[in-house]
Amino acid sequence: RLYKTGKPFNMTFETADTHTPGYASPKIKNKFNNQYANAIYYSQNETYKFIEWIKQQPFYENTTIVIIGDHLSMCSDFFKNKNGNRTQYNLILNPSPDLKYSKDCLKNRTWSNYDMYPTVLAAMGVKIEGNRLGLGTDLFSNEPTVFEEFGYDYVNKELAKKSEFYNKRILSPNGEKIAMHNTDDNQKYA
């Protein structure tokens, strides 16, 4: 229905079925003797079938598909090679034909999930002045990410700082107390 309106739209869905202990549909036939393995297989298979279905639709030509793995599996003992270099899986399929980028900017980047916001918008054809939104950098640009520019240690230290203004004016504009966790125990509530 959204396609038929002729207006741009976004559809987002999350597959949480691969969170521990694995939540495969009771309707599927188990392929493995392990619930978690079945959940991973089922999730990947359903995602594949959904993408193949989209490719057959009239709106595919104008559709950017983004698959983001927001973290590694929390069931680390499931994987046999514990020393392997496991990484998140991220895919941008069918980006806008207007997207211009150098292949060099896609390799060996130091980036974070913050960068996915402007990167996804750019993949959809949105022009971003300065190639940055919030803390994120469009990874299709040659602009350095905040982690490339300042390093992990510095950025993480800055992000860990507390902001009295933010806590009192944004999180608690009506003065209600907010539970806080602070490593130096100087402040328990905003």
Give the location of each predicted region.
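Solvent-exposed soluble domains appended to multi-pass membrane proteins
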Residues: R1-A190
